[in-house]
Regions:
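Short, acidic, metal-binding catalytic loop of nucleotide-sugar glycosyltransferases
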Residues: 254-264
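Active-site-proximal specificity loops/subdomain of glycosyltransferases
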Residues: 14-15, 174-178, 225-238, 242-243, ...
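Catalytic-site signature of metal-activated, phosphate-bearing donor transferases
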Residues: 2-225, 232, 307, 311, ...
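Acidic carboxylate-rich catalytic motifs and surrounding loops in phosphoryl-/glycosyl-chemistry enzymes
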Residues: 269-272, 296-297, 362-367
Length: 488
């Protein structure tokens, strides 16, 4: 009997060893299986999908038929992704590859229709978070479920194509219109070692007959990395899409006065302007002071989105400014951010801006051009609105603010406020209106658009702009003469 018990014990011990070794082997194989590809999964139900705050997303690296790896396996590596695109710890920066060879047309962003109702304007490589991302800025039909959109990265050295699925984030100022601004974010896989010059963006759609269709376009990728040899302290201006009958005088006055106030560069979006305006902008463009991008909105969207898709132009200019601007402001041609106790915006920011600030917002007062308070003797000054109109509202417009931001610290910028800093600890400061304010030259009306400002209330004289009058008059005359020679 004892011999029998000993045999059973030895027999069971051998099987325990075999089972243990098998378990170790399975664990090692599964670990190897997990480290060869990517799957990103986030879960959150309801309409939060479109807000980008913890989405249900799957991004999988797929090997194409030319890959040396097995065609039958999609190998998976899992990690957590939040709505703004942060993954794990340890910043990963791709090295710069060879200079991307592009035509002038490829360098200039414009809307391209990926499919009906999905319009891509520009594509950016963003490495500000711990995980690099491709950010696709687009206008999209809002009433349908978000499409299945993917980014494909080609690894030339391995003849491999890696594909990740996009996460959608909706801009918060789409105002319930049918079309709105979105950011679609694709993870840059770890196998991608150099910043891509281009990516293929694909969309999968299903028609009423349940036939699956795929459409793809290749887009150039621009980088948000600081350009080499760029000088810090540059202050840029982003102007929303230009349209309508805008006079050349107003444009030149805006550029010249804003330059006196500290701006070094302007970005404009051309929706529909006259030939004289284009020639005037071209004059500044040759000097490197202005960039003009075509805003080629399809007709079918124009009455179905807020202010000609302004929010996408804001996002595009934000990303564009990350490369060589320390600060950038977003406002219209009839607005000026004016320091009251400093010589210019740069000296103001040098004093008030701290490392924990992502930006500064300024309250507005309205100067009504119908209240022509001066009759200047000089013809050139007669052409300058800011040197002629000195009656403004005594009451400020606290909700109609305009902002100056550090573009690298912003995830989402609004029209009148900073919508979302890149990191939660960054602060947006409201600047005391006795230090600086927005001078807005427009007809003053009691309206919801003006946040119910009572324009029938008291007006008062404000001749702050006289500080800049002499220099502005000289610069305006020089610029106008140059523009006239170009037009003749």
């Amino acid at each position: 009997m004892p011999k029998m018990i000993r045999k059973v014990f030895l027999y069971r011990r051998r099987w325990c060893v075999i089972i243990f070794l098998s378990s170790v082997a399975i664990f090692v194989l599964s670990l190897q299986f997990e480290l060869n590809a990517i799957e990103v999964t986030q879960r959150k139900s309801g309409n939060d999908f479109l807000r980008g705050q913890g989405l249900t997303v799957t991004a999988r690296l797929k090997q194409n038929r030319y890959s040396s790896m097995s065609k039958s396996k999609d190998q998976v590596y899992q990690f957590a992704l939040n709505g703004e695109g942060e993954i794990g710890k340890g910043h990963r920066r791709l090295r710069r590859g060879r200079r991307c060879a592009r035509t002038k047309q490829q360098e200039t962003s414009r809307f391209r229709e990926l499919s009906k109702g999905i319009l891509v304007f520009s594509v950016w490589y963003d490495n500000r978070k711990t995980q690099p991302f491709i950010r696709i800025l687009l206008l999209m039909y809002r009433n349908d479920p978000p499409p299945s959109l993917t980014c494909s990265f080609q690894i030339a050295s391995k003849q491999t194509i890696l594909t990740t699925e996009a996460v959608f984030y909706e801009h918060n100022e789409n105002h319930h219109d049918r079309y709105g601004g979105f950011v679609a974010s694709c993870i840059v896989p770890r196998e991608v070692e150099t910043m891509p010059c281009s990516i293929k963006v694909s969309i999968k759609s299903t028609n009423k007959a349940q036939i699956v269709r795929r459409k793809s376009l290749t887009f150039p990728v621009s980088s948000t990395d600081r350009l080499e040899n760029t000088v810090g302290g540059k202050y840029g201006i982003c102007v929303p899409p230009l349209h309508g009958d805008i006079s050349v005088d107003r444009l030149v006055e805006f550029i010249e006065l804003t330059r006196i106030l500290g701006a070094s560069h302007f970005t404009f979006y051309d929706l529909a302007i006259n030939e004289e305006m284009r020639k005037a902008l071209s004059q500044y463009e040759t000097k490197g002071l202005v960039s003009v991008l075509e805003w080629n909105l399809p007709e079918y969207t124009r009455n179905k989105l807020h202010y000609f898709g302004q929010v996408v132009s804001i996002l595009d200019c934000l990303y564009r400014s990350m490369r060589d601007k320390s600060f950038v402001a977003f406002h219209d041609l009839d607005e000026f951010i004016v320091p009251l106790q400093h010589d210019n915006i740069n000296s103001l920011l040098n004093e008030i801006h701290k490392d924990y600030h992502c930006g500064h917002c300024f309250e507005s007062v309205v100067f009504d051009p119908s209240k022509d308070s001066e009759s200047p003797n000089v013809l050139s000054r007669d052409r300058l609105v800011t040197q002629r109109i000195f009656y403004r509202t005594s009451q400020m417009t606290p909700y109609w603010t305009k902002c100056i931001v550090d573009p690298r610290k912003i995830f989402e910028q609004g029209i009148h406020h900073i919508s979302k800093p890149l990191e939660e600890f960054y602060q947006a400061e409201k600047v005391d209106w006795n230090i600086a304010r927005v001078f807005h030259y427009r007809k003053c009306q009691d309206s919801h658009a003006l946040m119910q400002l009572k324009c029938s209330a008291k007006f008062e004289v404000d001749k702050t702009m006289r500080r800049f009058g002499e220099k502005l008059t000289i610069n305006f005359k020089i610029a106008s003469n140059a523009t006239n020679r170009r037009n003749s």
